[in-house]
């Protein structure tokens, strides 16, 4: 079991119960899932780019990504409905906790010119989204084998009812928010 999950059960739950005055342990917000998304718009011209992006995402997450297709045709972007234009992975359970642990302790500190994550990236319902400009911050990606530096979107979905609850949950995990 991931250390972060044990830490959540042993300490974070108690801390949040006293902070927000919950009556039941089930009211305490928890991390539900983490979604990693990589949009590869250049895949229209070269299909190999999408395969490489999917391989990077598989290495980062530990599971095979789903290839996302265009929902509708857009002439300005030269895409048709059904064209593969990206890939995504949804992490739950054990893999989710392991990824969150790696993200907080290893990947985020390796971001260039890092001054903390924005605390304003909550969606109003306690879910946090962030963008990473380079996939090479993850230790699973071999820098020498990277064909192109790509970014990815990371969305942490929680059961929190408000942004304050979500922020408190992630702050309890020592999420490096900007002061």
UniProtKB/Swiss-Prot annotation:
Pfam families xref list: Ribosomal_L5, Ribosomal_L5_C
- What is one GO cellular-component annotation here? ribosome
Q: Which PROSITE patterns match?
A: RIBOSOMAL_L5
Domain of life per record: Bacteria
Q: Does the keyword Metal-binding apply?
A: no
Give GO terms: molecular function aspect only. rRNA binding; structural constituent of ribosome; tRNA binding
Which example biological process does GO assign this protein? translation
The alphabetical list of record keywords is: Ribonucleoprotein, Ribosomal protein, RNA-binding, rRNA-binding, tRNA-binding
**Subunit structure, as described in the record:** Part of the 50S ribosomal subunit; part of the 5S rRNA/L5/L18/L25 subcomplex. Contacts the 5S rRNA and the P site tRNA. Forms a bridge to the 30S subunit in the 70S ribosome.
Q: Which family does it belong to?
A: Belongs to the universal ribosomal protein uL5 family.
Q: What does this protein do?
A: This is one of the proteins that bind and probably mediate the attachment of the 5S RNA into the large ribosomal subunit, where it forms part of the central protuberance. In the 70S ribosome it contacts protein S13 of the 30S subunit (bridge B1b), connecting the 2 subunits; this bridge is implicated in subunit movement. Contacts the P site tRNA; the 5S rRNA and some of its associated proteins might help stabilize positioning of ribosome-bound tRNAs.
**Annotated protein name in UniProt:** Large ribosomal subunit protein uL5
Native source species: Photorhabdus laumondii subsp. laumondii (strain DSM 15139 / CIP 105565 / TT01) (Photorhabdus luminescens subsp. laumondii)
């Amino acid at each position: 079991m991931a250390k972060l999950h044990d830490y959540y059960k042993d300490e974070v739950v108690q801390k949040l119960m006293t902070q927000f005055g919950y009556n039941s342990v089930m009211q305490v917000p928890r991390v539900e899932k983490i979604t990693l998304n990589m949009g590869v718009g250049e895949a229209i011209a070269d299909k190999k780019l999408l395969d490489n992006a999917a391989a990077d995402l598989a290495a980062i997450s530990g599971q095979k990504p789903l290839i996302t297709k265009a929902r509708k045709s857009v002439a300005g972007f030269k895409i048709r409905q059904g064209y593969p234009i990206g890939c995504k992975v949804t992490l739950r359970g054990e893999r989710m906790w392991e990824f969150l642990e790696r993200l907080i302790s290893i990947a985020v500190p390796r971001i260039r010119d890092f001054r903390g994550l924005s605390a304003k990236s909550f969606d109003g319902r306690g879910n946090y989204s962030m963008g990473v400009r380079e996939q090479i911050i993850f230790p699973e990606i071999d820098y020498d084998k990277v064909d192109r530096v790509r970014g990815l979107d990371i969305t942490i979905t929680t059961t929190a009812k408000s942004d304050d609850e979500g922020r408190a949950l992630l702050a309890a995990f020592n999420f490096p928010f900007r002061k």
